[in-house]
Amino acid sequence: LTTSADANTTAFDVLAIGRSGVDIYPLQTGVGLELVESFGKFLGGSAANVAVAAARLGCTSALISGVGDDPFGRYVSGELVRLGVDNRFIVVDETYATPVTFCEIFPPDDFPLYFYRKPSAPDLQVRPENIDSAAVRSARLYWSTVTGLSEEP
């Protein structure tokens, strides 16, 4: 990792901001959620997925997002590290739970999603003071979701 002019800031190849959460996928396909007997738990959220993809391609990556102060939030934070993403910009929110998304799998191309993010989500509570502006300025690529612009903290 290289550092920017600010000695405390790492210059990332990719710095993503936006959704992170837990995706719950059925381990059976072709049946509705009401008939599924077992599920798998996976890191989810578009921004988290982008950061992980960049890390898998050998880039240094970090994520700016929020998680709840709950077991799923700890899972998200730990999975990011395990998958090679710097998690120092993950904000833990004590008010809102970490979002969970369920998916049904009907091959070849029907994958209904059910988002549990209401009344709000921790990634929508990230405030300007939670964002390291030097990290944003020094990143080779800054990637943002549009969802993050849909609600003010």
Q: What kind of region is each of these model predictions?
A:
Residues F72, V76, D86, Y96-T98, ...:
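Generic hydrophobic, aliphatic-rich segments that mediate packing or membrane embedding
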Residues T2-D86, Q125-P128:
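Glycine-rich phosphate/adenosyl-contacting loop at the front of the ribokinase-like
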